[in-house]
Amino acid sequence: VYWGELNGRKMDFSTAEDRIAAYKWYVDEVRRRFDLGNYQYIDLAGFYIISEELVTPGDGWNHELKKSDEIIPPLAEYLHAINQSLNWIPYNRAAGYKKWQQLGVDYAYMQPNYFWEGQKSLSQFFSDVKANGLGMEFEFDENILEGEQNSDVYKKRFREYMEGAKKHGVYAVSYTHLRAHE
């Protein structure tokens, strides 16, 4: 898959090597532009993996395309060498949620996927989060606001997040993850 050129060489995104090179270029470019801003109250502390899955052989779909096990570790190593973190927010039980630390990700916050549908088991979610050293993403949107249709349902689900996080000790883990980079 042709992407463009980098340092005079045509990049082929079907290879992990070229994708890693492009990611490194992107990181360097973002840092360069950020440094030009001379921001007084903002720090660039890390980078975020947009994919909600980290696909490895036998875990997730289309490993041949995604190759997370080949791409994420060298990218994490590069980021760590320049004092940047690698962050990830998988959906509930996404591919890689048990392997994120092995791949070099620094902070991972799993989504409960409960706020909108309320059908998944929060008990299983909290068990998975604790067993795998994950933080929790507290999902919500404008539906929680007073005056929105069914806001009482969404408020109840959000309260269930908060109560479950406190009960299972997940609230402290998520907070500690955030404080670690200050």
Task: For the regions a language model picked out, list residue spans one by one.
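Conserved, mostly hydrophobic/aromatic
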Residues: 47
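Aromatic-lined carbohydrate-binding surfaces of glycoside hydrolases
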Residues: 1-33, 50-55
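Extracellular glycoside hydrolase catalytic/binding regions
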Residues: 26, 50, 54-71, 76, ...
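Conserved small/polar residues in nucleotide/adenosyl-binding loops
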Residues: 176-181
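Acidic (Asp/Glu)-rich catalytic clusters
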Residues: 34-41, 98-102, 125-131, 165
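Active-site clefts of carbohydrate-active enzymes
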Residues: 133-154
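Catalytic-core region of carbohydrate-active enzymes that cleave or remodel glycosidic bonds
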Residues: 128-134, 154-165
